[in-house]
From Swiss-Prot:
Functional description taken from the UniProt entry: Catalyzes the methyl esterification of L-isoaspartyl residues in peptides and proteins that result from spontaneous decomposition of normal L-aspartyl and L-asparaginyl residues. It plays a role in the repair and/or degradation of damaged proteins.
Species of origin: Cereibacter sphaeroides (strain ATCC 17023 / DSM 158 / JCM 6121 / CCUG 31486 / LMG 2827 / NBRC 12203 / NCIMB 8253 / ATH 2.4.1.) (Rhodobacter sphaeroides)
Family classification: Belongs to the methyltransferase superfamily. L-isoaspartyl/D-aspartyl protein methyltransferase family.
Name of the protein this chain belongs to: Protein-L-isoaspartate O-methyltransferase
Subcellular location per the Swiss-Prot or TrEMBL entry: Cytoplasm
HAMAP family linked: PIMT
Pfam families associated with the record: PCMT
GO cellular component terms attached to this protein's record: cytoplasm
Active site: S67
PANTHER family reported in the protein's UniProt record: PROTEIN-L-ISOASPARTATE O-METHYLTRANSFERASE, PROTEIN-L-ISOASPARTATE(D-ASPARTATE) O-METHYLTRANSFERASE
Length: 219
């Protein structure tokens, strides 16, 4: 259902969408501008399309979800992306998070273990002319060593601990944002900064994400 079909003006819909995101703590002007430019509706298919502008997670293919917009904004904000940064996203999903990051970074690499998700996200990237995103089928728990090191890494699935291969692929001074914890319990969103010697860990907020699974999916 489009905004015109349900009687809502597109400009009003966008204002309502951004207000919901801001009210939940997303205050970074660049992140808000990126979320204003990227239409979440382009990444939501089927019967849930008319709920694309609500601040809620929604089911997508392969048993995955598209994160609620406020969480996308908060994770992007915590990542503190600079315009010249090279970013790795682990867990392409619908492609919405990578699209938002593409407005903040020089280059975005996004990987997913599900072929269908990579294919469908790539189609949307092409349709929206997002030319600085490369989507690949890969086991994200091992990162993307051929493109490392990265200025920023964003993980959109929960690990029991920050994955060692991903930590190793961060530049000195680089930042990784990752949900950590058991999948059957509330997890913590962690911000990891790589130092000259070791890493600094900061807990940000409770979250709930699907688990980070090793291997390549069959779909």
């Amino acid at each position: 259902m489009t905004a015109e079909a349900d009687g809502e003006d597109p400009a009003e819909r966008k204002m309502r969408f951004l207000f919901a995101v801001r009210s939940r703590g997303v205050t970074d002007a660049r992140v808000l501008a990126a979320m204003e430019r990227i239409d979440r509706g382009a990444f939501v298919r089927g019967i849930f399309a008319d709920r694309a502008y609500e601040d809620m997670p929604l089911p997508i293919a392969c048993g995955q979800t598209i994160s609620q917009p406020s969480v996308v904004g908060l994770m992007s904000q915590a990542l503190a992306v600079n315009p010249r940064d090279k970013v790795l996203e682990v867990g392409t999903g619908s492609g919405y998070q990578a699209a938002v990051l593409s407005q903040l970074a020089r280059r975005v690499y996004t990987v997913d273990r599900h072929r269908r998700l990579v294919r469908e996200a790539t189609e949307v990237f092409h349709r929206l002319s997002l030319t600085n995103i490369t989507a690949l089928i890969a086991d994200g728990s091992f990162g993307l060593p051929e493109q490392a090191p990265f200025d920023r890494i964003l993980v959109t699935a929960a690990a029991e601990d920050p994955p060692g291969p991903l930590l190793a692929q961060l530049k000195i001074g680089g930042i990784m944002v990752v949900p950590v914890g058991q999948t059957d319990a509330v997890q913590n969103l962690i911000k990891v900064t790589r130092l000259e010697q070791g890493y600094d860990y900061e807990e940000l907020r409770p979250v709930r994400f699907v688990p980070l699974v090793e291997g390549i999916g069959s779909d």
